[in-house]
Every structure is written in C-alpha cells, then in structure tokens.
Amino acid sequence: MAKNTLIQKILENHIVSGSRTPGEAVSIRIDQTLTQDATGTMAYLELEAMNIDRVKTELSVSYVDHNMMQNGPENRNDHLYLQSVAAAKGVIFSRPGNGICHQVHLERFGVPGKTLLGSDSHTPTNGGIGMMAIGAGGLDVALAMAGQPFRIAYPRIIGVKLTGKLSPWVAAKDIILKMLSILSTKGNVGCMVEYFGPGVAELTVPQRATITNMGAELGVTCSVFPSDERTKEFLEKQGRGESFTALAADADAEYDRVIEIDLGSLEPLAACPSSPDNIKSIKELSGIEVGQVIIGSCTNSSFRDLSIVGAMLKGRKIADNVTLSIAPGSRQVLEMLARNGVLADIISAGARILESGCGPCIGQGQSPANDTVTLRTFNRNFPGRTGTKGDQAYLVSPEVAAAAALTGKITPPSELPFDCPEVAEAEKFLIDDSMMITPPCCGKSVEIIRKKTIGAPPLNSALPDKIDGIALIKTPDKTSTDDIMPAGVHLKHRSNIPEYAKVVFERFNEDGKPTFAQRAVAVRDAGKHGVIIGRDSYGQGSSREHAAICPMYLGVKVLIAISIERIHAANLVNFGIVPFTFADPADYDKIAEGDSIVIENLREKLEKGEYPVEVKAVSADGKVTSIKVNAKLTAEDVKIILAGGRLNCK
C-alpha cells in the first residue's frame, strides 16, 4: 500500500532525473516562474545571454514590487527594461502598484500540484494553495524559463499535524512563530515541511499562505498544504475554479519527523529583535512602549487580515506616541477595502496608506527612529533591515499590531476593552487583471529598452588550481544576505554591479578604515584571491544572487563557513565561488582576518572529490595553521565552479 506524502507525490510528477534518496541531487521540471524587479533585471539579462527566443514554462510572470520609489532614474529604467523584455520573451508583466509578487501570484496564478520557482526567497508562499513553490537565485530561475530542470536535494520531509481550532485573537502568524520556536532558523537545509491533520480544514488559503511564507525563515526548501475544499472555495472566489485539483498525502504517509500543534493551545506570539526565531509570548512583552506599527507585506495583508485591523480600528484613534502605516499586499485587496468602507475606517483612525508593494519590509521607507520599538507584521527582523542601525523590530500578527497601535504599547489583544471582531470572508474577490500586460504571440519584433544604468551580468574567470588568497572578513552566526548585500537605499543599483559591489558587507565596515570592497579590490588587483570566513547559517534570508555576484566581481573565490544556507550555496556555485564548510567547526577560531589562505591543487581535488581539502592559514607573524574543509558538490556543480560560473559553461 502507498505511503506517500503530498510532497513526494508532487515530486514524483516532476522528477526528470536523480535519486529519491534524501540528500541526493534530483532534477525537477518547473511549471511556473516568478521574478520581482530587484532580482528580475539580472535574471532576464541572464536569460538574454542564453539566446532563448521565448520562455519554455507553462507560465512566467515578472512583477514590479520592490523598487517603487522614483528617487532617480534607475528604478524606472529597470521597469522599462523588464516590461519590454517580458513582451519579447513571452512573460506576463505585472505593473508597479499591482501588488507583491507572492500575494498576487497566489490570487491570480497559483495552481495546486504545480511547481513554481521564484527569484525571491518567499516564493514558498504559494505552498498555501498546494503548490511546490521554491525560492532560488535569478540565474536558476532564468534557466527554468529556458526549459532547464531545477536541481535540489531530495528532501527530508517534516510533517506538521495540526489539530484543534485557533482561539479568538490568535492568528495564523502565531502558528508559524510557534514553528520557528521549535525548529529555529538554522539546521533545516534540505528539508521540506508538509502540513496535515484535522486542523488544516480550519485555515483559509490566505492563512495557510502566511504560514508557508515564513517557512522561508525556517530555512526549509518549501512548505506545502493539501489542496481541499478550502482551496476550491478560494479559487472559485478568484474566478479560477477550473484550476482546482484535490491533493493530499496518503492516510498512512510516513514522515522523517512529525511535529504536532494543537491550534487551540496557541497564544499570541512575537519574534523579538533581531531574529525571526527569537520567540516570546505577547504576555511576556506586555507594556513595552511602541513608536511605530506597520501592517501588511506579503506575509499578512490578505483581505481578512486587513479587514480585522479595520474592525479593530473602526471608531477609534491610534495612540499619540505611535505612527501606523498600512502596506497592502495587492491592488485587489486595497480596492476591495476601499469599496466596502474598511479603508476609510483605517484612515480615520490615523493610519497612513502605502502603495501595494514591499516597501518598508525591505527598508524602502518607513525606517523607525533611533531607540524606538517597531511592530511589524512582516517576515524578517534581521539587524538593520528596517533601514535604521540598531533597530528594535518585532514580528507580530495583525491583531497584535493593531492592539499596539491603539494602546501605544505591546498589549495582549485579549486585554482590549472589546471582543475579537467577527470578520466575514469575502463572498467573491474583485477580479481586475488590467494591471497585467499579456505578451504578444511573437516577441521577435519587440524592442528591448536598455538604459545606461543597466549593465550585462559580469563574468568570472576560471577557478585557479592554486588559491593564493587573503581572509578578507570573518562574519558572525546567521550572517544574512541582507548583511552581505544591503537593500534599502542601495536597491536601485541592482542592475549596475560595479556600483552595487561598493557596498558589499557595508554593515561590517568601520569608520576611518578601508571598506570591505576597497580591501577586496586591492587584493584582487594585486593578483590574489579573496576569501570569506563565515560561521553558522551563512547566507540565510533573501535569495538575492547579488550576494554571490558582487563578491565574485570583487575577486572572491572561496567561502569557508561552518554551514551555508541552501539558496546562497547554490548562488555561490552559479557564480564560481567554492562553498566550503569546516570539517571541524572549531577551526573557525584558528583563522584571523588578514591571514593568507593557501589551497594547493584545488581543481584536481574538486574533480576527484578528494575531501577533506587541506587549507593553510598563514598569520601575520608567519605561523602556519592547517585546517580541513569539505564541500557537498555534485559533478555538475564542480563543472560549473571550474569554469568560473554557469554563464561560462557551454
């Protein structure tokens, strides 16, 4: 009798090649792709370099949701390029203001049982509708658009059994925060999460999408919910009932690990500064003064989320010490709220309404004041991500955020002088796809608009046989791709690598000393190689491949870390940087910044798979320390690295 999980069923329908053994490489067919503008420009430049006339996927969509501020020509230049290249290559273009890629894709394009690859780490949002939705670097997405399969490690599958029903004031956000308290943000590479059990039927598709969205913070490849009557209801309300397929695991499915959560036992939670897995109950945090509240983002801006906020705010005013901003996830939701009067209630309470886009979640506006607590319904609170150094960002549910806006402090919603509002689900969603531009049947005659701020992807040189390098930096645990390549004010340079590379590791620069970029360029121009030394969970967070491209441009050839997160490790390979891990984690302490790093016969060792590889670290006083490193690379990975990156492979 079959004992397949839902994840195994979807994989089986998409596997092109590889072993079904957990941890071993497997290639899968990709049905749909999505890109957003911050990573999309590079992805489409890479697609152009492949000389593909038209995308080979069932559906590809290019969204503009990140670089919305027109503070200079760069962002609009990107948008013109993206719109024209989408028309040329057969891609649907979602115009600025239409909404955040993950929410809009869930609303208008998500199909149960299909695979989705996106150039954004929160692509797993669409697992809420029963898709296998995976975040990746832009080059991997470009390859998928070109018809190439996507390689992953065959997963270990964590089953999460949901029972019971959420209590008043407890939200879907609290479910995923509970998961983060159990699994943390590290140690889950190579895993996928599958939700099952009677509690699943108690959750709507948008609630499920909140949970799968923040599965990215767990570090898992993706999270998947069954496709059931709730899914059918959602699709029918979106006018897409024909996309429904019932999907579920076999009754006796076997998981590598099972976690059970009684929804009725949960209470409102928060992720405290400055990591999504620093979880405490709202009761523990009660009374902390709050200066800013922002509600929205791709995690928590569904019609239901913002409707309950509107109901809580109706007839009331926000506290004098608080600013409240609303960042709707899609134009669909924003217009529905405007039509039914909820938006007026929110505005009347004192809220500011932002454009439907990523905005403050990526440091694009609404940075908090110094020494100010900010409550956000977002998915990440990495240090400085708000745009304010030393920020104090808490991640909470819309209910908790609205309670704080009213009281001026962190407040358990159950202590408010009114009951939890009963908010009805929308009977039908507003359908208006006029902000989507469908490509012509043949795009060969379309002129691709390429302004001067958009440059071609830089190419790496082949990997040398000997690494004669310098340890340019040592980074702490959980160094994120935000730490490597900051967004915020620098985001507009994503299409201009020479300019963007100037801010690599900007957050670690010290006043009065050469920046990381300056030191890396000096090493590169002296004919040596840059080496980065990292601790645990290096490269967590965003899928931005610029965290590999820009260090590569600066001459970095090798990373040695205690552990490396999945998407970033793949991006390093794609751009010819060797992703090594310490054989003994204690050896991290044996290397100092500025040490010479020597690796002999590297090409031969990688080709033969001779691990561990010996690395010699030579200190300033001439002391030589020998350490051992490993790399989990497939034969294809080695081929790519030896060539200096995938774009060099023929």
Residue ranges: model-predicted function:
Residues M1-K650:
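Fe-S-dependent hydro-lyases/dehydratases of central metabolism
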